[in-house]
Amino acid sequence: MPARHLYFIMTNTWNRLALLIFAVLSLLVAGELRAGVVVGGTRFIFPADRESISILLTNTSQESWLINSKINRPTRWAGGEASTVPAPLLAAPPLILLKPGTTGTLRLLRTESDILPVDRETLFELSIASVPSGKVENQSVKVAMRSVFKLFWRPEGLPGDPLEAYQQLRWTRNSQGVQLTNPTPYYINLIQV
């Protein structure tokens, strides 16, 4: 076995071992883990016939959280249409203070929809950052979290049923592996291939 392959295997093994040790030690010193803000969904659909949609935010902790929200063009997922034009949707209010044990509502508003395609869905990113308040107490850590959710703009009158769109996916084997083609106007999320 060449030395560089052995080095890679050992490095990979040592990295896994170091990660396992770090995880175990983190659990031993963690003491107490508290949840923060829960967002009412994992992906959101904005129908074109609506002026706005609402998203529920729930503070499950004993401290206040500052929530910062914004909508961007997609950068994290394949299939997103690259564009330099700002998203024609707005998160309001952009800053929300959630007191302990309360809920708040984030509204997504359309600013102009005539620049979006009418023959297919458009993908956006809804970015929600949660920042804890208060002082850090002895031997504890506070972590700000940024979650990014898929937000789909769905024009009116698209053909077919979005819940059945996955049945129209076309799988083709080629020299590089398998190619998947989606002939529908809907984005389809695959859980497992």
Regions picked out by a protein language model, each given a short descriptive name:
Residues 5-21:
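Bacterial N-terminal signal peptides that target proteins for export
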Residues 35-60, 160-173, 177:
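Beta-sheet-dominated interaction scaffolds and their linkers
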Residues 53-59, 108, 124-129, 178-182:
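Buried hydrophobic-core signal for structured, non-transmembrane domains
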Residues 113-156:
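Terminal connector regions
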